[in-house]
């Protein structure tokens, strides 16, 4: 699908160019493929790592197969995590990933479950009459959700997730994730940063909690953002300890990227 401003459609070259332009040390990516035919059998998070010059990366599958086509939940024989320093084998799958230039000391995974029911979801589709994708509603079954975390040698643990689009279910998942993030932070003596597509509008991710949203910016759709679904949450960073990175469309995602620079 053509995503403005990229008029040539998705490609590995476009991915490398977009990731390199972000000039980031750590990236958390959602909705990525691992050895799936629809993306030419590419390990997308490894390609992301290559584009940004990162050694460490990990992919955590949500499902085996392709969403919206044929997929199944993971079973006991499926690897829960594939990283740059592992030799595990995994069938074509879909999930989330992290790539980091900063050394990763330990990877973590948390299962968040899924909604037993789906719901109509607004998604971008090809348009025959416009260079901008059209928006339409389709009924979508919710896939299993999870969180992937990387404990870094710089004193931070980065948490990545893609929560359910079903109201209420996503709030329950976020509550569980926040609790886990604080536990991991305490165990590793690191500061937690929670990143990802939370499928929740502004203020809801931090309501009635000690967490704060470091970036308040509409992120979806990327060619004319009307709502914020993507966040960077912290339970302890002060405004003078970070600055917000510039935001611009990448042409490879229907979401805008957000980022912060930690000030030392």
Question: What positions do the PLM features span?
Answer:
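Catalytic metal-binding/acid-base residues of hydrolase active sites
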Residues: 33, 63-64, 103, 162-164, ...
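N-terminal, active-site-proximal structural segment of metallo-dependent hydrolase catalytic domains
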Residues: 1-93, 171-176, 250, 264
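Conserved beta strand-loop-helix elements of the APE1-like EEP
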Residues: 50-53, 77, 87-107, 152, ...
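Acidic/histidine-rich helix-loop elements
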Residues: 1-13, 74, 120-140, 164
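Active-site beta-loop-alpha substructure in enzyme catalytic cores
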Residues: 144-148, 153-183
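Short, P/G- and charge-enriched loop/turn segments at secondary-structure junctions
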Residues: 81-88, 134-138, 217-221, 245-249
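Beta-strand-turn-beta hairpins that frame and shape the catalytic cleft
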Residues: 92-110, 116-125, 141-160, 262-264
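Metal-dependent phosphoester-hydrolase catalytic domains
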Residues: 109, 167-193, 198-264
């Amino acid at each position: 699908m053509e995503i403005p401003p990229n008029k040539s459609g998705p490609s590995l070259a476009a991915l490398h160019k977009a990731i390199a332009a972000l000039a980031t040390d750590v990236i958390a990516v959602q909705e990525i493929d691992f050895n799936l035919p629809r993306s030419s059998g590419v390990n997308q998070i490894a390609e992301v790592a290559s584009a940004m010059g990162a050694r460490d990366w990990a992919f955590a599958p949500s499902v085996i197969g392709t969403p919206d086509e044929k997929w199944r939940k993971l079973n006991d024989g499926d690897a829960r995590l594939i990283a740059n320093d592992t030799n595990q084998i995994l069938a074509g799958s879909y999930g989330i990933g992290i790539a980091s230039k900063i050394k990763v000391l330990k990877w973590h995974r948390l299962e968040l479950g899924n909604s037993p029911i789906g719901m109509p979801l607004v998604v971008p589709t090809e348009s025959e009459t416009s260079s901008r994708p059209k928006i339409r509603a389709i009924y979508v079954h919710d896939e299993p959700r999870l969180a992937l975390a990387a404990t870094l040698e710089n004193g931070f643990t980065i948490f990545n997730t893609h929560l359910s689009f079903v109201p209420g279910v996503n709030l329950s998942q976020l509550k569980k994730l926040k609790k886990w993030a604080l536990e991991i932070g305490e165990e590793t003596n690191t500061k937690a940063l929670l990143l990802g597509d939370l499928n929740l509008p502004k203020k809801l991710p931090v309501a009635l909690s000690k967490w704060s949203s470091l970036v308040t910016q509409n992120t979806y759709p990327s060619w004319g953002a009307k709502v914020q679904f993507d966040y960077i949450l912290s339970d302890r960073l002060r405004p003078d300890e970070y600055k917000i990175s510039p935001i611009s469309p990448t042409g490879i995602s229907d979401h805008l990227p957000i980022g912060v620079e930690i000030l030392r």
